[in-house]
């Protein structure tokens, strides 16, 4: 006979099948009643019920049973792993706990959930990943798409061999098998059951040089978290930070130019500052284009034993912000955040038992949100507007494509987003700077994670991502760029290949070609329904040779319109009634190619018109035959 817990689980599943349980409240009510009926001393977790549910029933019950749905509300499952205890190269900041002497990674107390998990697994990356994935699956989360976060102070200052070994072992754990090299592990992960769609490294601005950035990206990094703390050189020197704002500006620019997403850690309440000064420095983050991060984490200073700030506090030389002061300041800061920024965190994950002074409550984000709501001040950050977190589901049919343009670090950023009402369904970050290529630094579609290749997510796999990429390509071509590169997670490479991109590691790339100015020979009368001027689509196929040597016909986006005179469309003669010019969209693709022009005679500059026969092929041997698209008037 089944034990009481199994009977309870199967009764709940049957109640769901029959429709007697339809939401979380009714499920919890029935669960408590069954606990009493079966004389259980404690209430079994939802993970127990999930362990007995199978197939379609399990999938249908997930929204009711999943614990902490916010863990995957953004469309991916975050897996944080921590490096072994190691000190920062410059020493210790006045506020910083942890380090090798403390048996924890620098800047961590060792009591945070991720730190405890790391210690429990001997700081072994494979075991940490496997442990966290198992935890997520037990509480009902999908783990097809993993956002890998490498924590532990200053990862990029570690020995390069350790860095590569650590990352490889993370990929091995996701793949479920060992590889000889990191490259082999990455290649396996491109088609693995659990794919790494993004990878984050934590570091300092002064030890993330161009060489270190390139190494991190070769390992798979798509985002960096920089300990910025405050934009005040005197205060940074006072807390023995070891760098100033110049390093922050330099590092931010280097990261953006290479296509990384940039997250700043901001620490209100440092010695020597005040709420007013903190707010002034925070305002500078977005007023000055040398900064303007993509993401933020707020870490209001907490006094922890074993730090210099702790000694200052004991001596009466320093007092941290109290709860009311911190909540008011964070509300003021959140109200300033632009729509292209995502606030990742609002407080540290340090247990209250480890905090000697400062904020000890764990729901500061909710307290800040409540204060802003009471004051009628909305937060416009991405996280607060994500479709995956909204109780009122947006209407996909009413989604609008928006383009928020701003300058940052010597380049132009396009924050492209599909929004319905006040909700963000998905977005892309496109950067145009002095480099020859446009860079898609991020592509994101929100909602419950869809299984890879399936159409079972809230918003994923519904075409929003493809449309965002197409718009980014259009803007790139319009700006005169002939190439787009994407900062792609290892596990997303297959997706970009399906869009015509090729491997240009650490990027995925597509070569855009500007349309060719062409001419045709009029022949035959024009049908009466063809306008004298208008948009005509030519029947053009593309045979593509990519830099990686592969060939084949591909589907490509439409290029900027060019002027041609039409000889025939679809085999039927069609000419402008006045014999003048019309506009036509011409598909373009990547690499060296030839256009197979059907029923249209045209030639590129430098090609003899007699060599361009109707229905024939017009060769484009080099880029000299390409012209820049006309710029908007």
Task: Show where each model-derived region lies.
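Flexible, acidic/Gly-rich N-terminal and inter-domain linker regions that tether
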Residues: 1-128, 132-178, 339, 520
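Conserved non-cysteine loop/helix-boundary elements of the Radical SAM core domain that shape
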Residues: 111-128, 148, 152-263, 267-324, ...
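Radical SAM enzyme [4Fe-4S]-AdoMet core and its adjacent flexible, acidic
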Residues: 300-341, 348-391, 459
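A conserved beta-strand-loop-helix scaffold within acyl/acetyltransferase catalytic domains
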Residues: 405-448
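Conserved acetyl-CoA-binding loop-helix of GNAT-fold acetyltransferases
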Residues: 456-475
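Conserved GNAT acetyl-CoA-binding A-motif
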Residues: 475-488
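Conserved active-site alpha-helix within GNAT-family acetyltransferase domains
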Residues: 488-507
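Intrinsically disordered, low-complexity segments enriched in glycine and mixed charged residues
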Residues: 517-633
């Amino acid at each position: 006979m089944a034990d009481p817990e199994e009977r309870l689980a199967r009764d709940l599943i049957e109640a769901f099948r029959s429709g007697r349980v339809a939401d979380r409240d009714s499920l919890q009510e029935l669960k408590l009643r069954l606990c009493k009926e079966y004389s259980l001393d404690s209430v079994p977790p939802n993970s127990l019920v999930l362990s007995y549910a199978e197939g379609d029933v399990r999938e249908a019950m997930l929204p009711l049973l999943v614990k902490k749905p916010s863990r995957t509300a953004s469309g991916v499952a975050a897996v944080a792993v921590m490096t072994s205890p190691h000190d920062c190269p410059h020493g210790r900041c006045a506020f910083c706990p942890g380090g090798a002497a403390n048996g924890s990674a620098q800047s961590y107390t060792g009591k945070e959930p991720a730190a405890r998990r790391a210690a429990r697994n001997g700081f072994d990356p494979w075991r940490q990943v496997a442990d966290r994935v198992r935890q997520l699956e037990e509480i009902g989360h999908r783990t097809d798409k993993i956002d890998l976060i490498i924590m532990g102070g200053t990862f990029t200052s570690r020995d390069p061999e350790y860095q590569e070994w650590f990352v490889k072992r993370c990929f091995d754990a996701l793949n479920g098998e060992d590889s000889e090299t990191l490259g082999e592990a990455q290649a396996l992960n491109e088609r693995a059951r659990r794919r790494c769609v993004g990878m984050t490294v934590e570091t300092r601005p002064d030890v993330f040089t161009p060489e270190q950035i390139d190494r991190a990206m070769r390992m798979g990094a798509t985002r960096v978290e920089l300990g910025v703390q405050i934009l005040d050189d005197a205060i940074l020197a006072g807390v023995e930070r070891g760098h100033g704002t110049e390093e922050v500006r330099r590092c931010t620019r280097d990261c953006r130019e290479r296509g990384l997403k940039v997250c700043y850690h901001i620490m209100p309440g440092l010695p020597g500052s005040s709420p007013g000064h903190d707010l002034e420095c925070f305002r500078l983050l977005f007023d000055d284009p040398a900064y303007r991060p993509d993401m933020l984490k707020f870490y209001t200073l907490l006094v922890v034993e074993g730090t210099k700030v702790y000694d200052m506090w004991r001596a009466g030389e320093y007092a941290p912000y109290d709860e009311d002061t911190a909540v008011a300041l964070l509300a003021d800061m959140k109200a300033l955040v632009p729509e292209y920024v995502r606030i990742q965190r609002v407080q540290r994950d340090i247990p209250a038992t480890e905090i000697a002074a400062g904020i000890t409550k764990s729901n500061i984000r909710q307290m800040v949100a409540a204060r802003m709501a009471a004051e009628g001040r909305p937060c416009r950050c991405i996280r607060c507007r994500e479709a995956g977190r909204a109780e009122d589901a947006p209407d996909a049919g009413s989604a609008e494509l928006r383009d928020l343009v701003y300058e940052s670090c010597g380049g132009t950023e396009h924050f492209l987003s599909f929004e319905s009402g006040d909700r963000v369904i998905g977005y892309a970050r496109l950067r145009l700077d002095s480099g020859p290529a446009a860079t898609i630094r991020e592509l994101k579609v929100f909602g419950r994670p869809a299984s890879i290749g399936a159409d079972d997510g809230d918003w994923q796999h519904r075409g929003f991502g493809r449309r965002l990429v197409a718009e980014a390509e259009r803007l790139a071509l319009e700006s005169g760029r002939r190439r787009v590169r994407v900062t792609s997670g290892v596990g997303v490479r297959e997706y970009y290949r399906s869009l015509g991109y090729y491997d240009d590691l650490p990027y995925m790339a597509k070569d855009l070609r500007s349309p060719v100015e062409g001419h045709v020979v009029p022949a035959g009368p024009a049908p009466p329904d063809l306008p004298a001027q208008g948009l005509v689509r030519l029947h053009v196929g593309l045979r593509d040779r990519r830099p990686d040597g592969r060939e084949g016909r591909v589907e490509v986006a439409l290029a900027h319109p060019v002027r041609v005179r039409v000889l025939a469309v679809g085999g039927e003669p069609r000419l402008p009634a006045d014999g003048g010019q019309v506009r036509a969209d011409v598909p373009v693709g990547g690499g060296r190619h030839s256009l197979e022009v059907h029923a249209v005679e045209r030639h590129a500059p430098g090609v003899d018109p007699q060599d361009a026969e109707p229905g024939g092929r017009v060769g484009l041997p080099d880029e000299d035959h390409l012209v820049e698209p006309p710029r908007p008037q």
